[in-house]
Amino acid sequence: MLCAVYKSRKKAETYLFVERREDFSRVPEVLMSTFGRPELVLMTKLDPAKPLGIASTSRVIEALGSQGFYLQVPPPPENLLEQHKAQLKVSR
C-alpha cells in the first residue's frame, strides 16, 4: 500500500498518513485545523514486514483502510525525576 506522510507545522513530531497525496477528504476538519498546513515529508510503500519509526505498520495500514488516515503523535515526555526516584528506591 502506497501512502503520503505529512508533518505538522504546528505540532512538533506529529505526522499524518493519508492514502493519496494531497487527499485530506477523509480527515476531520477539526483535526486539520489543529494539525495546520501539512508539509509533505515522503511517499512510501507500507510493508508490514518493514517497521516504521514509532507507529506499527500494520496499525497504519488498518487505519488507512478503515478511516482514510492515521495520526502519529510523539510519545509522552519522559519524567526523569520519577525515574530517578524509582532508581533510588531500588538501590536501597
From Swiss-Prot:
InterPro entries: YcgL-like_sf, YcgL_dom
SUPFAM superfamilies in the record: YcgL-like
Domain of life: Bacteria
Gene3D superfamilies, A to Z: YcgL domain (3.10.510.20)
Disulfide cysteine pairs (residue numbers): none
YcgL domain residues: 1-85
Family annotation (PROSITE patterns): YCGL (PS51648)
Record-given protein name: YcgL domain-containing protein ASA_2166
